[in-house]
Swiss-Prot record:
Name this protein carries in UniProt: Glyceraldehyde-3-phosphate dehydrogenase
GO molecular function: glyceraldehyde-3-phosphate dehydrogenase (NAD+) (phosphorylating) activity; NAD binding; NADP binding
Family as reported in the entry's similarity comment: Belongs to the glyceraldehyde-3-phosphate dehydrogenase family.
Keyword hit for Cytoplasm: yes
Organism of derivation: Paracoccidioides lutzii (strain ATCC MYA-826 / Pb01)
EC primary class: oxidoreductase
Lineage, top ranks: Eukaryota, Fungi, Dikarya, Ascomycota, Pezizomycotina
Entry EC number(s): 1.2.1.12
Amino acid sequence: MVVKVGINGFGRIGRIVFRNAVEHDDVEIVAVNDPFIETKYAAYMLKYDSTHGQFKGDIQHSSSNNLTVNNKTIHFYQERDPANIPWGKHGVDYVVESTGVFTTTEKAKAHLSGGAKKVIISAPSADAPMFVMGVNEKSYRPDISVLSNASCTTNCLAPLAKVIHDNFGIAEGLMTTIHSYTATQKTVDGPSHKDWRGGRTAAQNIIPSSTGAAKAVGKVIPALNGKLTGMAMRVPTANVSVVDLTCRTEKPVTYDQIKAAVKAASEGELKGILGYSEDALVSTDLNGDPRSSIFDASAGIALNDRFVKLISWYDNEWGYSRRVLDLIAYIAKVDAGK
C-alpha cells in the first residue's frame, strides 16, 4: 500500500522528509508547496545538502514548474494560503505541514479545503493530538484529521522514558537536550526580543534555551504527566543532538539492569525506533541515523539504585523526518481498516 503524500514547506524538515521518502516503500511524494522557493532553486536545494550530502538520485526541473525526481513527476506550487493548494487534483491523502507556521488545528485544517484528508504537523502543536511512534501511535483514531508528530526531542526522549517507566517506574526527572543549532538562530549577534540569548551567534556560543519536549512526554505517556520537565543547550554543531535524562526511579535498579531493559526493547518492540550502543560514540557518528533515539550505554551513570543519568543520541533532522513518514504509513493502514 503506497500512500500519496504532499509537503507544505520545503525548508529543512520538508526537504529531509522528501529525501527519506525516496527510501520509504510505503510513501510517495507527489506534490510540494512553498511560496518562497521557485522550482529551479528547489531542485538545487534538494540535490545539495551541506549536512547530509548530495541527493542519491536524479533531479530535474521543467518549464512547467514541476520537479522530476528519479523519473517521477513532483508537482510544485507556490501558494501562500494552504486552502488554495490543489492536493486533491494529485490524489494527495496526507499532507506534511512543515512550514512551522500552521501548527494549530484551525490553521492546519485549511489543507483539507484543497482535497487532503489528513494533515501531519512536523512540529509540536498547542491543540492537535501528538503521536510518537513506538509510544502512543496505537491511540490514533481515524476520525482525527489533524495530528502532530511532536518534536525531534520528544521523539528521542519518549521511547527511552517509556522503557524506564514500564520496567522500573519514573518518580520524577529532568531532561537536558544538548541540541545542534537550527535555522531560527543567528549567524551573527542580532535582535531577538523574546529570547535575548537566542539572538547571539549560534556558531560561537553554548546557548541555554527553553523546550517543551520533556513536558510533552506527559501528553504521549499520561502516567508521566507532571513528572518530567527540561531545558535545552543550543551548541555550535550543525546536526545531531543528545538527550540527558536524569531521573529518580520508583523501584531500586542497577545501571546494568537499565542497560538490559533498553537493549531488549531495542531488539524487540522498539526495533528501528530505539537503538542501543556500547561504542564510544560522538555526535557525527549518528549523522543520518534513521532511529528516533540511540541509547549510549557507556555514557550514562548511576549515583545510587534510584537516581540515574541516561544519555541518548538523535539525528534531529533525519531520524525525526523518518518518523513523520512512519507515522503517515501507520495511520494510512488504520484509516484503510488494516
